[in-house]
């Protein structure tokens, strides 16, 4: 099957790859698809969705159909297991226009945000077991939300898209906000892509996500008050430290030095796997993807190289004596950032192998002293996958982590995963 994209065909193919326009089905005969994801894992990642031992991954049931010649609708539900419990989540529930003029398209409801390269793709299409550390930290693995999206694809030979999203923002909300904005997230993005000859294609994107509810409050005077309190009540302080301040902070922290659990999204009041661990006022993203397939034919062998960089600005609003200011805190950075680079090579129709390296630089709160400590992740991963068909994959992956402050995780992780798709399934995105 040839995957060659020429000129405007690249733009058309990019649109056809979206779930709203690919294999639309009908009201009397809707598309129904089921994705089964299971695994065994030795070890755990910080902010990861997969726990040690046997478990269910991103098991997905989706219904989609064209409502008429003007609208398309889709519902995607996800089953996941965490801490011995199984939860049912609604990941997508949206309608999208099919016939707006001038290359415009409108989507409304709950959907995956189009920030970056990976986020708007379903988890079962990933080449690795979990998303990179920067995705787990800043987007809660994959960011979906309630809102609207308007995008425009230019009628040009070079694929060019502009888009805007307005979203509720609850999964990206900072902890401790008293009166958050109802509409919290505004996102602008652009994508550019094309072909180089018959065998090469590429896509680049830029995104700016404004999060009105993203800045966590920091109290400057708390540090001095707490030191005074420590000096006067040494024994009480030692007792609190031993028990991890369970009552005050709502943590089940039996190991007071494991700061990696103290700033994750449980503290934000969100589901353990679907809220951002680190938030800020502005999130910037740049991504680039390159694909090679001999003669444009992806069936036998092809190479994909992708990379993204995230910059999270102004993670905190500092309060001193009741006055809130944006600015520098002597104990912590003014911004967090992270990136990854991956390469995946399919060397015959049934086998592929890949390497990925990524880093995250952030800060975690030491609750006993109200101090910020640098928190870093360096993650190296290698995988090999067997593809009996286009609808199934068995993947073996090794992950090595170099962690700073993220103590509640493992340095070496081995994961064996299966992922199969049943029923109708739309084309994958570029």
PLM regions and their residue ranges:
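N-terminal low-complexity, intrinsically disordered patches enriched in charged
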Residues: 18-20, 118, 316
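Gram-negative bacterial Sec-dependent N-terminal signal peptides
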Residues: 1-22
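Outer membrane beta-barrel
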Residues: 23-172, 180-198, 337, 342-347, ...
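A short secondary-structure junction signal
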Residues: 161-163, 173-178, 216-219, 319
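Outer-membrane beta-barrel pore domains
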Residues: 47-48, 94, 200-210, 215-233, ...
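Short helix-to-loop capping/linker segments positioned immediately adjacent to catalytic or ligand/cofactor-binding
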Residues: 174-178, 192, 274-276, 294-295
């Amino acid at each position: 099957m040839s995957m060659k994209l020429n000129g405007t065909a690249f733009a058309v193919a990019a649109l056809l790859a979206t779930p709203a326009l690919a294999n639309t089905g009908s009201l009397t005969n809707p598309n129904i698809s089921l994705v089964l994801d299971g695994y065994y894992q030795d070890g755990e990642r910080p902010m990861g969705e997969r726990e040690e031992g046997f478990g269910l991954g991103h098991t997905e049931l989706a219904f989609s159909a064209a409502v008429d010649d003007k609208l398309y609708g889709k519902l995607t539900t996800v089953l996941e297991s965490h801490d011995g419990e199984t939860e049912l989540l609604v990941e997508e529930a949206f309608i999208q226009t099919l016939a707006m003029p001038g290359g415009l398209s409108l989507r409304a409801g709950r959907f995956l945000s189009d920030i970056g390269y990976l986020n708007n793709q379903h988890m079962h299409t990933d080449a690795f077991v979990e998303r990179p550390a920067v995705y787990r930290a800043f987007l809660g693995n994959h960011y979906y939300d309630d809102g609207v999206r308007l995008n425009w694809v230019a009628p040009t030979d070079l694929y060019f898209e502009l888009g805007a999203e307005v979203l509720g923002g609850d999964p990206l909300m900072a902890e401790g906000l008293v009166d958050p904005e109802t509409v919290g997230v505004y996102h602008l993005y652009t994508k550019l892509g094309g072909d180089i000859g018959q065998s090469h294609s590429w896509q680049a994107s830029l995104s700016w996500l404004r999060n009105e509810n993203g800045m966590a409050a920091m109290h400057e005077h708390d540090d001095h008050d707490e030191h005074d309190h420590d000096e006067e009540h040494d024994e009480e302080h030692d007792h609190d430290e031993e028990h991890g301040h369970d009552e005050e902070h709502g943590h089940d922290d039996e190991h007071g030095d494991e700061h990696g659990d103290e700033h994750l999204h449980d503290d934000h009041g969100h589901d353990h796997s679907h809220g951002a661990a680190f938030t800020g006022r502005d999130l910037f993203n740049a991504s680039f993807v390159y694909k090679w397939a001999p003669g444009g034919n992806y069936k036998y062998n092809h190479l994909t190289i992708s990379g993204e960089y995230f910059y999270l600005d102004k993670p905190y609003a500092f309060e001193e004596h009741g006055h809130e200011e944006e600015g520098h805190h002597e104990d912590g950075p003014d911004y967090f950032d992270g990136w990854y680079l991956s390469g995946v090579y399919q060397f015959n129709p049934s086998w592929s192998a890949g390497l990925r390296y990524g880093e995250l630089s952030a800060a975690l709160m030491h609750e006993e002293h109200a101090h910020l400590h640098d928190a870093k992740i360096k993650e190296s991963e290698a995988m090999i996958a067997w593809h009996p068909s286009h609808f199934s994959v068995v993947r073996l992956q090794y992950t090595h982590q170099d962690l700073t402050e993220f103590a509640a995780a493992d340095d070496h992780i081995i994961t064996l995963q299966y992922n199969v798709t049943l029923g109708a399934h739309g084309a994958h995105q570029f």
